């Protein structure tokens, strides 16, 4: 079945006298298909909300669990946890992407959902055991690194890494594949309503559907990043039994709470994903038989440089898989937009993260002011999703991306300049204003690049390219964690800020070069339209 064909195209086999009846059947079929698509999209939002809320709650609480084990006297376990988890995504992201490309959609989603939540559930049990100490140990000033504790800590690190790579894979499958298929269905429904619909109108319908969906997904992401830690913090305070300030007695109840959240998420995500799959028959096209057919059709592919690819991957028997995967990624017409996005993951210093918070305290800024403006910064990120929606209706995606990354660069230039201002009040105003407004540019750029990749990455390598993108994002995040191991003094914040500013500057340069040197690749062509179908 070609997803570009109208979903309902019944012929009037019973003669002209039955034509009105056939039209009625067609209209009813279109309405039913439209209702199913709308229902599937709401199920997608619900599933994504539970996925992100449970993930953000776990990431927030696991840092507290690990810090509590050291009596909140060291960040070494928190840092090591971040290094292990992000390094895992960095090294195995592309492999997960390959698996997505060659597997049945529903089977992959169920596997990722089940294993991810089970990994977190098991890790919460490990945390509960780790934080369960005999009350006599409250007199001990340091953590108990006995054999049992070491094994538990290693298990928590490994299970957290498994959960993160599976969560990354699930997001790649949904955001880079499922949503694209559903957008094509929306385009077909529009065509079925009016058989005279032009191809350009079909593309606009698909792009508008993608834009609306991507905005809602990012709004859910940002809302969960704000609400999950806030709600978790409130519940943690209510669970404080006051039995001990050492070794995390008051956090044992929190481990059970996080376990319950993930168990609920497992059930909801599993049900919603299955319902979406059955509501949208086109998602079933990636059955094992059709995968083989796709491979036959794409046995030989030529990238922009004229190199031959087999099954969407560069022919090579001697190269390591990671190099082959990178070659496939950088052979895509939209690769430098994705690379520019990954460079923004270097910006942790100028983003109201932990590093910036510590530096502001060191400069004498009050915690209440920091907390207030951190909330404002998050709200500005949410505002960015609305700004994107407005810009996308008036400008092309490429132009939206160029404007947003340039805007973020200008905002962070103000932040970087503030570090050399001696007046504390002027410094604070410049830094906070730059950071808050830069969040608008960041999320507008994120959504525009995501949609460009959704539209331009061919079906046989969607998972692989998405996996490589996740790996590169994780790679630049790991670089910051490594730097943090050696630059722990707040006085070194300028170095982190320089790295962040350099990352955003490089992102703007790479994206600008791609736009102005290769703008022809964004012109609508028949090949581009075919690339958007499954």
Where are these regions (language model features)?
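Substrate-agnostic recognition of the 12-TM MFS/MFS-like secondary transporter fold
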Residues: 43-60, 81-119, 151-239, 258-272, ...
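Transmembrane alpha-helix termini and helix-breaking/packing motifs in multi-pass membrane transporters
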Residues: 63-70, 124-140, 222-261, 362, ...
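C-terminal ends and interior cores of transmembrane alpha-helices
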Residues: 114-149, 406-424
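Multi-pass alpha-helical transporter architecture, strongest
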Residues: 126-127, 261-277, 412-419, 498-534
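Helix-loop boundary and gating motifs at the non-cytosolic
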Residues: 23-90, 328-378
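A helix-boundary/kink motif common to multi-pass secondary transporters
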Residues: 71-74, 101-108, 240-241, 249-251, ...
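Alpha-helical transmembrane segments of multi-pass secondary-active solute transporters
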Residues: 77-78, 108, 213, 253-258, ...
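Juxtamembrane intracellular "pre-TM" segments in multi-pass secondary transporters
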Residues: 12-41, 275-344, 362, 532-534
